A protein has these predicted regions:
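Basic nucleic-acid-binding interfaces
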Residues: 2-39, 48-85
Length: 85
């Protein structure tokens, strides 16, 4: 769980959006309760309490910076990962 916490902090602080590994971002979403389905190169994440769908595609082995920002906005908007869920 320590690695997921480290990834979560990196995503939330937003200092290194271009340096987040794609697989780490996927792992973070799964640990927050998202379900993943894959269609071609698209990894599509949905969550029962989130109205939005997250659609991610890797850029090499990194996540695309604008998609990291989208994930950050959803985590903060829906207060995901907060102890009082």
């Amino acid at each position: 769980m320590a690695k997921v916490d480290k990834i979560r902090k990196a995503v939330l602080f937003g200092d290194s959006d271009a340096n987040i590994a794609f697989r780490d971002l996927c792992s973070l979403l799964i640990s927050l309760g998202f379900s993943e389905r894959i269609k071609g190169g698209h990894h599509i994440f949905s969550h029962r309490s989130v109205d939005e769908i997250i659609n991610l595609q890797p850029k090499g082995n990194k996540a695309k910076p604008y998609q990291v920002k989208q994930v950050r906005n959803i985590i903060t908007r829906y207060r995901l990962g907060v102890n009082d869920e």
